Amino acid sequence: MAAITPSWALETTADGEVKEKTSGPGGQWRALNVGPDLIRSLLIRKFKTPTPIQRAAIPPALSTPPRDILGMARTGSGKTLAYLIPLLQRTGSTHHGQGPRALILCPSRELAVQIYTVGKDLARGMNKGKGKGKNKNEDEEDEEGKGKEGLRWALIIGGEGMDAQFEKMSSNPDIVIATPGRFLHLIVEMHMDLRHLQTVIYDEADRLFEMGFDVQLQEILHRLPSTRQNLLFSATLPSSVAEFAKAGLVNPLLVRLDAEQKISPDLALKFFSVKPGEKEASLLVLLREVIGKPNQPEPADPSSAPQAIVFVATKHHVDYVAELLRTTGYRTSLIYSSLDQVARQQQLAGFRSHQSDVLVVTDVAARGLDIPIMDHVINYDFPAGPRIFVHRVGRTARAGRKGTAYSLIVKEDFPYLCDLHTFLGTERMGEPADVLRSLPIEQLSENVEYVFHNLDETAPHITALRNVMRKGQGMFERSRTKANPTSYRQAKSLASALSNNPPRIDDMFEDAMEVEVNEEKARLLAKVAAFTPSETVFEVGKRESESAIIMKKRRKTVDERQKRVSKAEAEKSTASGMEKAPVKELPAPQLPSKNFKDPSFYLDHTQRGAEAEKGYSLKSGVESLSGAITDMTADEGTGPKAQKASQLSWDRKKHKFIKKNGSADGEKMIKSESGALLPASYSSGKYQEWKSKRRHMPDGPVEALALGGGRRGRHGPPGQKRKAEDGDGGEDAGGKGRKDQGKSKGTGKGKDDFKQKSPGKPGKKGIKQSSGLKSAMDIRKQREIAQKRKEKNARKPQKFRK
């Protein structure tokens, strides 16, 4: 495996250094072997210069034979185009109709929609570029009206109707963009053939290969051809390719750019130390400073209005914070994973079009979303891992723009702040004690009073949401991953340091004089909070009593004795150290000495960059522990019985024990081709039901492809028995032939269902039900009956007749 960064990937594009091959418009793209139609589409969309990750990833992806690539670059560096350009170059711009040729897997629906939009827009420019430079054959085809069709794209995500996705996949799309769960559902339901697949792209690969998508990816990868090309991209990728062994990589090229610089240099980080009861007030103070006061008149240009993304821990936090901000006066959108797909799209579209000021989300929107002109990100709840923090703050400071990330830190978050400091480094972040700031006390107290008193009276439903949020917060704190043990020790020292010297107020709030006054208030409040009385509770109010005087004298005597003992121990340790010290260790004039240690041949006790790689790693402590667990078989006869009994559960409807079919919660499971257990709902027969409905509709291009060229004629292949269909008694029908139709018993002239066939006698083959397609005679008779009823109902009653 090659872990290199090509030198040409880091070259600058300064004036005068461009070679002849890269001269002219799009010359730098031509140097990467990008086709002219694709270059034209890129230039139309103002992509004139490739980014470093694009320079490093595109040439090996277009090489012959194509190489597997693991690409890592910071957020906002153009990773989407780094894999879309080679993909469009290989698939071309025309539809082949042989099934999917490329698959893009994404961990979230919003990211899939974004890639779908960017890819179709880029391919549309390629199709428009085909109008120039046609050859004779293409001119003849255009004259005959047989022009080639453009690429077909399919977006397969959860939360949407299955029938529409059946139709998309039946039309044999060229490029499929999907989330793993829904795509696996369609694969199993439709028995999809993926042998023509050439390229598989894993966007946000570290998230896809975590434990949450393990079963889905295992089954999808089992059905993919072994000759495919794999492209894995993310902003946080570990250097160990062994963590992606399931992807089936062959001689992969690892491209890691900006590995030392995990986040954008244009991103400013601000950390505020707050108390748990002041988080809501702190959020309002930040929003008022960042966005402005609520209920302000809309500016003339809505696109220039500032916006902010607020990241919270759970969906209960989303509901509470969003309702709090709405009540305060901010236009707010919200997104979380269990929200309906239509609602998610509407909320995100409203935020993109500046119909809302604040977007409150969980980590579902922390990856890949590219929201233009996003300058502010607020971490209401601090993330439990450095990778999540990198993806959260990566929503701002993208494509050369500047941005700011604000984080609210409570005392319980100090270990995770120390973890982040170890991951980013002191040069980028600074020491935790130095970077922590505080908010103005007066503004905090005003907003605390507003949230917990005024709002509770005017909006009592917020109190109920707050109680639900607190329960969710407790569950979140118990379930989130633990920080490094070293970080807990650092957090204790950080907390003690802040108790003696509280953090100063950030410069973004007030001028110098007011800041000094507020800092004096903060120091005074910190001293009051840290004050511990020397008297016990039993001595309060009894200073002149005899017992209080005795206790005071006793305490004074003990304090003086402790001071004498500590002073004697310090003098003794100093004297013993001087007595035992040899002559050569006594203080002597220091001469300049030479250090002969060669840093290039010096071995540290830890590997360089080990902490950063630990932050990038996909396996948490829980996953590593689960991999070390071994199930043991019982060594006596009662063991198997107990194991078998544990697989049974009581069914309250059937009033008996039933066997669980694989799932721990009793959900029915089926075994796939790879041996994995999947929910039985993945093979529910919905596709066959949809197919049976479609086969009686007029044959179009989609139906013809879905049914293998349309409906067959009356005569099937030789030797095959003809089925009973359309009311025609075939060889498999219950009757003897066409003469026996309609002679079943139980029909009468006065009945509307006299054409319905009898199910037949028990023990014999019954006549099969009609497939639903009526003959011309049936339609004519049905119309006659309907007309007679209409005429009968239209007649006037006898008493009104003349």
From Swiss-Prot:
GO terms for biological process: rRNA processing. GO terms for cellular component: cytosol; nucleolus. Residues 789-802 have a biased composition (Basic residues). Gene3D superfamilies: P-loop containing nucleotide triphosphate hydrolases. Signal peptide: none annotated. Pfam families: DBP10CT, DEAD, Helicase_C. Keywords: ATP-binding, Helicase, Hydrolase, Nucleotide-binding, Nucleus, Ribosome biogenesis, RNA-binding, rRNA processing. A motif (Q motif) lies at residues 27-55. Its EC number is 3.6.4.13. It comes from the Eukaryota. It is an enzyme of class 3 (hydrolase). InterPro entries: DBP10_C, DEAD/DEAH_box_helicase_dom, DEAD_box_RNA_helicase, Helicase_ATP-bd, Helicase_C-like, P-loop_NTPase. ATP-binding RNA helicase involved in the biogenesis of 60S ribosomal subunits and is required for the normal formation of 25S and 5.8S rRNAs. The Q motif is unique to and characteristic of the DEAD box family of RNA helicases and controls ATP binding and hydrolysis. Belongs to the DEAD box helicase family. DDX54/DBP10 subfamily. This is ATP-dependent RNA helicase DBP10. It comes from Cryptococcus neoformans var. neoformans serotype D (strain B-3501A).
